[in-house]
Amino acid sequence: MLEDKIYTLEEIRSLGIDTHEYVFMDQPGETTGTLVLKAESRTQSKRLFFSLSDGRKILTPVFWWQLSRGFQNIPTGTVLKLTYVQNSTGQIHLENAVPV
C-alpha cells in the first residue's frame, strides 16, 4: 500500500507507480470506491485515484475551486461513497466524497 500523501509527478515516475489503467469517470451518479493514490498534476489541480466496488479504476481531477471541499485530505485507503455530477458543459466531476 502507498503512503498517505500527495505524490509529486517525479515521485510517481521514480517509484514506477503505474496509473495507466485509470480512466476518467464517464457518467454521473453514485458509486463506492477506495482511495488508492493522491497525486499532483501539471496544473494547480490534484488527482485522486479510486478503485471502485465494480472493479473500475477511476482517475478524478480535483480542481482549484474544489480544494476547499477537502477531497485531497481524505486518507489513502478510505472507502467512500462518491457522487459524480455533470456540469452545464457536459463534463463529469466529483461533487461529494463521504466515508462509508
Model regions: which residues?
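Transition segment at domain starts
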Residues: 1-20
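Structural detector for short beta-strands of small beta-barrel domains
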Residues: 4-7, 24-45
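Intrinsically disordered, charged low-complexity linkers and terminal tails
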Residues: 47, 68-72, 91
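OB-fold/S1-family single-stranded nucleic acid-binding modules
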Residues: 85-100
